[in-house]
């Protein structure tokens, strides 16, 4: 399939830059009502008015007919490789159980750990590919995939190897940025020995994953009852010393100092942040840490939404992601994520577009190559079925994507 494409008559709407956009700059979008984009060998080589020749040998020509052309969506926080499902826990939550109380009675993450350890490589890979196909139809062209449902050497490596295998497929629909999340929970084998488990991750897992080049980033669940701030600092500093980008699940359940730690370490991102303090928000803004907000999780858990408006007004770079996982948020719905962010977190449409494209890319350390429609970046696009980008939150929870284009290849026509 050719990776040479010329898109004409497109209403181009895109953030610009090779780093995250912060604060007021999140509202600044390039807007070309009738533009052309040229992609050569999968890379954007021209963006501008309809002034170049549309007839070029070896290029497919796509007439956008005035519809909105956006950068491909970047879902920068998912847990897409896992065994089993947990529908019963969803019902327990409806009946009043909390996320942490379910974990304390042996459910939650540990439930999925057991199922993931038992599942075969092919079973897990097939399920992940199904999720990716579904997400691609909603405009996702790059996704983050975390491990963290193994909590032992072999299963963590299995999860990461599955994502590597998908990335090596030449006709893949979505690129996966892999994140090692061995510190997702304390495995049963290490009950009461959390320091020893952190040492195992530092001394055995990180060097092995680094040598095998199985992950780009390292994450930890920094939360009361899971891993402490000091344990998180120790693991992430070790990861940084090996060249990993660092990320944190931070301040989701209680205000715990995770955002402050992310600022101290100058991490790529701090995620969740439902309970982030004012000082934590300030630390994120001052240290250029992307605040990755996950409105679907707050929606599912019936928790207050993260203070997206406050974060942007404080100078933060905010990203949006789905948090697809089998427990707290069994959804990869980009349309609903977009709507909830605008309705409940009070993001403008322009801010939400930036959050789910360029800032999502920055949260993965990839803003230099994806996240905006600019020469030199990958030819990843979303073509909407309308000329008005405001359709994204207005068409609440419904898919407004007409075409998904990956590296110049047209993947889906909805």
Curated annotation (Swiss-Prot):
HAMAP family in the record: HutI
Subcellular location, record wording: Cytoplasm
Organism placement in taxonomy: Bacteria, Pseudomonadati, Bacteroidota, Bacteroidia, Bacteroidales
Positions bound to Fe(3+): 77, 79, 249, 323
Binding-site residues, 4-imidazolone-5-propanoate: 86, 149, 184, 252, 328
Positions bound to Zn(2+): 77, 79, 249, 323
Cofactor: Zn(2+); Fe(3+)
The protein's Enzyme Commission number: 3.5.2.7
Residues annotated as transmembrane: none
Cofactor note: Binds 1 zinc or iron ion per subunit.
Enzymatic reactions: 4-imidazolone-5-propanoate + H2O = N-formimidoyl-L-glutamate
Entries under NCBIfam families matching the protein: hutI
Protein name as it appears in the record: Imidazolonepropionase
């Amino acid at each position: 399939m050719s990776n040479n494409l010329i898109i004409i008559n497109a209403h181009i709407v895109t953030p610009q830059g090779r780093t995250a956009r912060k604060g007021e700059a999140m509202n600044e979008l390039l807007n070309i009502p009738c533009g052309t984009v040229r992609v050569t060998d999968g890379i954007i080589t021209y963006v501008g008015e309809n002034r170049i020749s549309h007839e070029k040998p070896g290029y497919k020509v796509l007439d956008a007919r005035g519809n909105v052309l956006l950068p491909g969506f970047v879902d920068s926080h998912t847990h897409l490789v896992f065994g089993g499902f947990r529908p019963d826990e969803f019902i327990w939550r409806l009946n009043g159980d909390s996320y942490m109380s379910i974990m304390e009675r042996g459910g939650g993450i540990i439930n999925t750990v057991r199922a993931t350890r038992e599942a075969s490589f092919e079973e897990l890979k097939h399920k992940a590919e199904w999720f990716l196909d579904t997400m691609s139809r909603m405009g996702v062209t790059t996704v983050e995939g975390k491990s963290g449902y193994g909590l032992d050497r072999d299963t963590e490596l299995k999860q990461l190897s599955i994502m590597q295998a998908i990335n090596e497929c030449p006709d893949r629909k979505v690129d996966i940025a892999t994140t090692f999340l061995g510190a997702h929970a304390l495995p049963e084998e290490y009950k009461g020995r959390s320091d020893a488990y952190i040492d195992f991750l530092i001394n055995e897992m990180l060097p092995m994953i680094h040598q095998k080049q199985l992950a780009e980033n390292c994450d930890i669940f920094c939360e009361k009852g899971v891993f402490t701030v000091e344990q998180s600092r120790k693991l992430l500093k070790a990861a940084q010393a090996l060249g990993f980008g660092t990320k944190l699940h931070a301040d989701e359940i209680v205000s715990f100092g995770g955002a402050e730690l992310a600022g101290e370490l100058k991490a790529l991102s701090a995620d969740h942040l439902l309970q982030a303090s004012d000082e934590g928000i300030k630390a994120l803004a001052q240290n250029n840490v992307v605040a990755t907000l996950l409105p679907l999780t707050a929606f599912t858990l019936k928790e207050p939404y993260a203070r997206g408006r406050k974060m942007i007004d404080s100078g933060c770079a905010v990203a949006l992601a789905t948090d697809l996982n089998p427990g707290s948020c069994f959804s990869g719905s980009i349309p609903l994520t977009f709507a909830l962010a605008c309705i409940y977190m009070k993001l403008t449409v322009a801010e939400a577009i930036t959050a789910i494209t360029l800032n999502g890319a920055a949260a993965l350390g990839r803003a230099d190559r994806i996240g905006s429609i600019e020469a030199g970046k990958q030819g990843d696009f979303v073509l909407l079925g309308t000329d008005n980008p405001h359709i994204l939150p207005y068409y609440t929870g419904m898919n407004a994507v007409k075409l998904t284009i990956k590296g110049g290849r047209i993947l889906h026509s909805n």
